Amino acid sequence: MVTVVKTSPFEGQKPGTSGLRKRVVVFQQPHYTESFIQAIFTAMPAPGPQGATVVVGGDGRFYVKDVVQKIIRIGAANGIARFIIGKDGILSTPAASAVIRARKADGGIILTASHNPGGPENDFGIKYNTRNGGPAPESVTDAMYKATLAMSEYRTIDSIADIDLSALGEQTPFDGFAVEIVDPVEDYVRLTKSIFDFDLIKRFRSENPHFTLLFDALNGVTGPYGQRIFVEELGFPQSSLDQCTPLEDFGGSHPDPNLTYAHRLVERVAKERISLGAASDGDGDRNMVLSHDWFVTPSDSVALIAHHAADCIPYFRSNGGLRGLARSMPTSCAIDRVAQRKGLECFEVPTGWKFFGNLMDAGRLSICGEESFGTGSDHIREKDGIWAIVAWLNIIAHVSQTIPNTSVRSLMLDFFSIYGRNYFTRYDYEEVDAAGAGKMMDRLRGHSTDIVGKSFGGGAFTVAKLDDFEYTDPIDGSLSIKQGIRIVFDDSSRIIFRLSGTGSQGATVRIYIEKYDSIHCDQDTQEALKPLVDAALEISRLEEFTGRKEPTVVT
């Protein structure tokens, strides 16, 4: 029954911060995808694949359904006892985490390249989540990579006919092996309703007919989740949804919720004077929040949610408040100020949601976020776009009980009056020459001593420190090095340089700019930060090393 297929190692099958991402044509090479799937099962944490239950689903992009069938056959040959698979291969990343935890599965395989474009000419990805519902830690991804380097064969059962992914219920290809097709929305909606005050939000909506919502799923996986939660559960009109049909190529667009790629939402929110506009990405773990008169940066969004959560959100009230807060290193320090005021621990971790998981499992972290439009809490072990949007609705509804006409803008201005404002922007230079970008980073690292004390921006900014961020996990002691170059100035302003690991080809240079102001909190962000941006380009000599004069995306 089991067929052993001989193969040899493929170059470059090293999982990044969010699994393995490559062009579709790379995954379509003979034995390429099968070899990586085998590596996942080979490296699966103890007790291993024998008798295990594994959740499988994806963001609906091209090639998902084909790979689901490969996973079923290879998993069966490696001893998996049960697969739990989202209908039609659909399962948002947050929902996959929720299903893993709710069904007490041994892990999950998520087929996504997140916010990267989809379709035959674009990207595909495979990531593995462990039994806590979170992304595999480096110990597991390192074991997977080691398995790819030693790959000589993979096991499969080709006699298993294609499973009907559209039919809910259990199918049993042979004794001792079952495939269960589940509603991809059900467990997630049940969890979300247990976290937030849906009755309060519904009452607010009915009492404030002028309040409008516009949710854009960017033709990614969250369309069905938005339909169920915003329309069927909370009662917003159908017109509150846009681009909510999952498409294999995301409608030919880039499913990344930022001001550049979600321009359709931005334009509609402004034109129609929408009260709360929101978008999610391809696999549903990212979010963007704005209104007709305010754009909320992700750094400010997580900080504001943390400020209000213990008072407004039932999940945190019933759990005795917040245990701790955290952010990725490049994310602005706004949430640090919330933690300080509320007497909470605040952790600074490398980019990659997996670094939050240990803190959550240890009971030391409740809410966290990344500047890359990722926000979440300890209800699951992934960032969660829908969660963040419903959190905003819950907060607006709660505050409106005592302050009528509460809006996104009024909430942010109130927040700044308490904490001051961390002005923040990010410049992305996508698909630049990797060699040139690497040389630029090496040169910056070489400046760690001789740049301190030098001034830039016409003398406005004096360097106090340059380092390459490293992180020692306070729970398991693991060390992560070279996580981003930080330049800190004597006024606490920061410039950070990173090479992203989420692209499928070339390199993406990200520059993060941050400046704090406790007095002038209503400036235009780009105007407030222009001197620091100029200093960043001067220090890095980015154009010289990459040939780029302008960023691909400004957030």
Task: Report residues per predicted region.
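A short, gly/pro- and small-residue-rich
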Residues: P120-A150, L290-I305, E382-L393
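Gly/Ser/Thr-enriched, mixed-charge loops and adjacent short helices
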Residues: V2-F10, P120-A270
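An N-terminal, well-structured beta->alpha segment
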Residues: M1-A77, T172-L213
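Glycine-rich phosphate-binding loop plus the immediately following alpha-helix
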Residues: N132-I163, D300-R323, R327-R337
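Active-site nucleophile and cofactor-binding loops and adjacent substrate-binding regions
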Residues: I84-T93, F295-P298, A326-S328, V349-T351
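Buried hydrophobic positions in well-ordered alpha/beta secondary-structure cores of metabolic enzymes
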Residues: S18, V56, A96, I109, ...
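N-terminal small/polar loop signature for handling phosphorylated ligands or for N-terminal nucleophile
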Residues: T42, Q50-N122, R228-L290
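Phosphate-binding and adjacent anionic-ligand microenvironments
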Residues: A270-L276, S280, V289-H292, C312-T555
